[in-house]
Amino acid sequence: MGFLQGKKILITGMISERSIAYGIAKACREQGAELAFTYVVDKLEERVRKMAAELDSELVFRCDVASDDEINQVFADLGKHWDGLDGLVHSIGFAPKEALSGDFLDSISREAFNTAHEISAYSLPALAKAARPMMRGRNSAIVALSYLGAVRAIPNYNVMGMAKASLEAGIRFTAACLGKEGIRCNGISAGPIKTLAASGIADFGKLLGHVAAHNPLRRNVTIEEVGNTAAFLLSDLSSGITGEITYVDGGYSINALSTEG
């Protein structure tokens, strides 16, 4: 029996089999969890439903996190199928493509800043607020996906780094707020992975190569490795952990200097 047997988990942000969210979903299902999913636009519904079916789920709901009405509707609909919620995965991030290349100050705009923060950062407390009644008193857990650009200046990551910094603050505040209700909240800072979302960052291939050459493991991490970490953080095995950011990056974040060898 898997360590997530009987757990009910809602996963956001799964848009392809290369998505980190897919790696998380697969790991959770392998450990016995029941899953539900969201999609953001109608053209993705069929694709997400197909992947959900492969993971033994028929629970797929539309949710544009820029809309409080859609967020609230997801949990209203989910409540018709489940009596509660044990896990929530926030795998959501977006910034206009033109803001993810070149000079930071030249690329940033008020509109790009607001969009990146609304979708990538505000969406975590917005989802947690709506999920709270279903998660309360169940030893439940929230996991959100971040990146090293939250705390380091990564070329071309630009405004998304600011949004991820805000997300990580949101993880800590959410953990502090919900702990007394038996709800934990943690983050995973994953190393760069070639996903559809990552393709919007300029020179991403160079970033992948640099990280693989300079982290202690001398390779990039996989969605399976991130998925296994998320499954642990969503389980009772991690019951004493909340408000933390766990790095799954092959050790790249420990480096003071990037040297060959």
Swiss-Prot record:
Name used for this protein in its record: Enoyl-[acyl-carrier-protein] reductase [NADH] FabI
Keywords: Fatty acid biosynthesis, Fatty acid metabolism, Lipid biosynthesis, Lipid metabolism, NAD, Oxidoreductase
UniProt entry tagged with the keyword Oxidoreductase: yes
Gene name of the record: fabI
NCBIfam families per UniProt: PRK08690.1
Binding site for NAD(+): G13, S19, I20, D64, V65, I92, K164, I193, K194, T195, L196, A197
Known pathway: Lipid metabolism; fatty acid biosynthesis
Catalytically driven reaction(s): a 2,3-saturated acyl-[ACP] + NAD(+) = a (2E)-enoyl-[ACP] + NADH + H(+)
Enzyme active site: Y147, Y157
GO molecular function, one term: identical protein binding
Upper taxonomic lineage: Bacteria, Pseudomonadati, Pseudomonadota, Betaproteobacteria, Neisseriales
Subunit-structure text: Homotetramer.
Family: Belongs to the short-chain dehydrogenases/reductases (SDR) family. FabI subfamily.
Leader sequence residues: none
EC numbers: 1.3.1.9
Functional note: Catalyzes the reduction of a carbon-carbon double bond in an enoyl moiety that is covalently linked to an acyl carrier protein (ACP). Involved in the elongation cycle of fatty acid which are used in the lipid metabolism.
Positions that bind substrate: A95
One Pfam short name: adh_short_C2
GO terms classed as biological process: fatty acid elongation
General remark: Present in outer membrane vesicle formulations which are used as vaccines in human.
Biological source species: Neisseria meningitidis serogroup B (strain ATCC BAA-335 / MC58)
Family annotation (InterPro entries): Enoyl-ACP_Rdtase_NADH, NAD(P)-bd_dom_sf, SDR_fam
Lipid biosynthesis listed as a keyword: yes
